[in-house]
Amino acid sequence: MTKSWADGLPVRVEAVDAQGVPSAFGWQGQAHAVERLLQRWEVETDWWAEEGSARRSYVALITRTGLLCVLFFDFGTTEWRIARVYD
């Protein structure tokens, strides 16, 4: 069953490559090495609002253990979070 979290759950990114894509991250007490990047995109919402916008950089990837997931970097909080995990 696919699980998703609109605001994401915290992950610990241990390393990023030259393009800023995670090459390893920690989640739920386990280390995950990234096998392959599938897709990358950016989203900016509410750019017109006085209180500011939310800007995120998303990556869909597969880990070496076969976990298919979507992570995002939140430019406002400077944190990496996991948004979705596919079964």
State each model region's role.
Residues 1-87:
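Non-catalytic peripheral regions of nucleotide-handling enzymes
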